[in-house]
């Protein structure tokens, strides 16, 4: 029996609507070190998207270095595989040397069928396989995600029978049945990205990465999800890591909740109600996404909201009863004059309240001034062209 922690999609260095997440990510790594110690974890598996960018900042690299060092010191073997956000070459630097210290980084196509063996359990870390790059090199029959994973799993199946213990596969892919969030980068190729879970048949456990919501695809196939929410679409998700006990023919998996540095709140309503409603008290200390439904857009809405909800990061307006027909289509624009278009826009943003006569007069003046300025610029351009021709 081997005890594993399955995690993925750390996205170290990412920001959340311009708010840096390094402190929250450091807190998660502190938590993970404690779990390794308290639960007697043999290996930590990180199934892709270790970094958020191909070229991470120095602080981000230092955070990863400190984190994996402490995990190894706590007694775990650490296995990282690259995801579609990672630079395989940069993440895989000095991987052979680091493996001797207990840090196994798999980013290469050359070791797909070569496992990391932990207590007789063969762990096969498959990096993200970009079909256009991997297909020919690993003998896939077509350039799709399903084909390259089938080819990679063919190498795993060739090796696995020679091993005495269970087989565990790490992969970074979109597997059929998984639910997406707003924060994943699309990996579709020609509109085809999903891989059927049957491609992993015969593995005792499959530790998936890429989708940020924790979910079980089958009894043996799971996404750990990202340990930290990366979009407001993940507000209701229970973030964590999967603690897995596995041996041949036996599997037990449970979620270990991750610490929540800051909760997320999604609020909707008119400005007055949101500022007064006591039911929103918990949102006062959360990162907030707020949609205002006032029929007339309030002045200084963000400033007012931030007096109660100081960490309002996203503000949208969806007025009740607002016109939903797009006003910017080519047909509508061609049929309307400049003054009418400006008046229509003013009415649109004010939920149908048309411009007054005084406002139309101001708009008419502004439109005429813009025509004069535009005409002067065109005249200057024509003169410059004429001089150049001369």
Segments (PLM) and residue ranges:
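A conserved active-site cap/scaffold subdomain adjacent to cofactor or substrate pockets
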Residues: 197, 204-260, 266-267
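Catalytic-core regions built around general acid/base machinery
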Residues: 63-75, 192-202
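N-terminal active-site segment of His-dependent metallophosphoesterases
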Residues: 1-69, 73, 365-369, 389
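Divalent metal-coordination and catalytic microenvironments
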Residues: 9, 29, 44, 49, ...
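His/Asp/Glu-rich metal-coordinating catalytic cores
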Residues: 56, 82-207, 211-216
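Residue-level detector of anion-binding/catalytic polar loops
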Residues: 42, 77, 104
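Accessory, non-catalytic peripheral segments of nucleic-acid enzymes
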Residues: 38, 43, 246-390
